Amino acid sequence: MKTKTNQNINVGVDTGKFQLDIYIRPLDIYFTVENNEKGIKEAVKTIKKYKPERIVIEATGRLEMPFILACANAKLPFTIANPVHVKRFAGALGQRAKTDKLDAQLIAHYSEAIKPPLSKLKPDTMQAMSDLVTRRNQLLNMQTMEKNRLQIMPKELAMTIKPVLTLFKNQILKIEEKIVKLIDSCPEYQAKNMILQSMTGIGKIAAASIISNLPELGYINSKQASALIGVAPMNRESGRFKGQRKIQGGRPQVRTVLYMAMMSAMQSNPVFKATYQRLLEAGKPKKVAIIACIRKMIVILNSMLRDGVMWEAPKVNN
């Protein structure tokens, strides 16, 4: 294959457990490699020849990370795309057929047409903390499922569930200990953690999730902060039609943690308790009121981190 320098070259990568399907647009080059160290090295070497403007790969959980790390080490520009955005793009094109090759072509087309912003890798410690928070959430979900089974199983089977619950409890405690140690190992995280936890309702897990999954907090404005976690209401209007404003998008892992934090804050923090009650009295549904409180919480936390100040209820209760 001849090398060609073209600033408009976009690469789409469809990720599978065992294989990567790669399409280079507009050169109409398609090839596959195994999703292992050897295959990824070959893919990066080939892609680098064409000096792409952007390489786009969908976020699949963890399968894409070895390829992304290789791109970062090779100083290749990459974007980790939200699969929902790519799916909507396919819908706009009217594309329903689905094969690995077509998916790679679609992702490359999405890259060329939408030009999504380039991604950056998190520092190792931040990625480690994000992984720990994710793993803790996974363990909590499995623990909840086992607790639910304990309620419906006969006594002779309940005895097989109790040791599993003990195992989950111990593993969760170990994960939490690792999170605390990781925060203590980094002065920047220590400072952020102290500010975040000064707000009643924000505990160590919520603080760790914000630090690792929302590193922009403190450097952005209020609207951007709300949008990043998906609690900014979006208008749905067209002509005379005025639909109900709804939240969408954002980073669900942070939103979920803050939702749980708000459940605590509404009981123990007078500012959010009063806000919640006021919204209910105004006729707002409970879930809408909770989301509004979360939006208020993230705006306040953003300003606290920006100004480097601790939580002081009288100053923010307005």
Language model regions located:
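Long, charge-rich intrinsically disordered scaffolds of nucleic-acid metabolism proteins
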Residues: 79-199
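Phosphate-backbone recognition surface of nucleic-acid-processing proteins
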Residues: 208-282, 286, 313, 318
